[in-house]
Amino acid sequence: MITLPARPESLTFAPQQSALIVVDMQNAYASQGGYLDLAGFDVSATRPVIVNINTAVAAARAAGMLIIWFQNGWDDQYVEAGGPGSPNYHKSNALKTMRQRPELQGKLLAKGGWDYQLVDELTPQEGDIVLPKPRYSGFFNTPLDSILRSRGIRHLVFTGIATNVCVESTLRDGFFLEYFGIVLEDATHQAGPAFAQQAALFNIETFFGWVSDVESFCHALSPATPLSLAKEKRYA
């Protein structure tokens, strides 16, 4: 068992009965020229997040935690995205950007394309699980719940992009399904202004889960392990 310092209080759990979830660390969300960048969102601060996720993944893997990687997107014909009868058709900024810029049609969040791929610095390894998801929440239309329940996993540690969209959506759905959700704040990044990150973390800490950081997570798993973290204070 480990005890992880977190807000509003510490949590105690077994690493082998928990999972580290890496949400949507794709070129779409973390790279210049990806969907978020093309849609007008600032992705300039994602490099430290990638470094910190790598650190968290290495610590989790060494401790025997299951690592689950999500990739958000759809088939190259966008059937999975939903047509005009779907709210996703109207609210997805990727779909809206492609309608506004026809030259991008088929390039954003399409399975098999560069935008859909995980960033080069983050590579799943044997024993990890990689799951596609068609909507913001990793629980919707995916086998995530059955994967976790069949392994007796109740504690989920979240990293990835975007904190205020897919990370928070997945953590919230997990809360409703009786999972304990913890987000590592310095291994996440928001889509939008800094207050979106602050608001998401407030919601999680106050209503739906717990907030910790990569250093605390790694020290809890292996107190003697030296860390290599990206130190960048981005939020007041």
Curated annotation (Swiss-Prot):
According to the UniProt record, what class of enzyme is this? hydrolase
Enzyme Commission identifier(s): 3.5.1.110
A family per Pfam:
Isochorismatase
Where do transmembrane segments lie in this chain?
none
Record has DNA-binding as a keyword: no
Source organism's superkingdom?
Bacteria
CDD domains per UniProt: cysteine_hydrolases
Q: Which family does it belong to?
A: Belongs to the isochorismatase family. RutB subfamily.
Q: List the NCBIfam families hit by this protein, alphabetically.
A: RutB
Q: What is this protein called?
A: Ureidoacrylate amidohydrolase RutB
Organism the protein comes from: Klebsiella pneumoniae (strain 342)
Task: Supply the source organism's classification.
Answer: Bacteria, Pseudomonadati, Pseudomonadota, Gammaproteobacteria, Enterobacterales
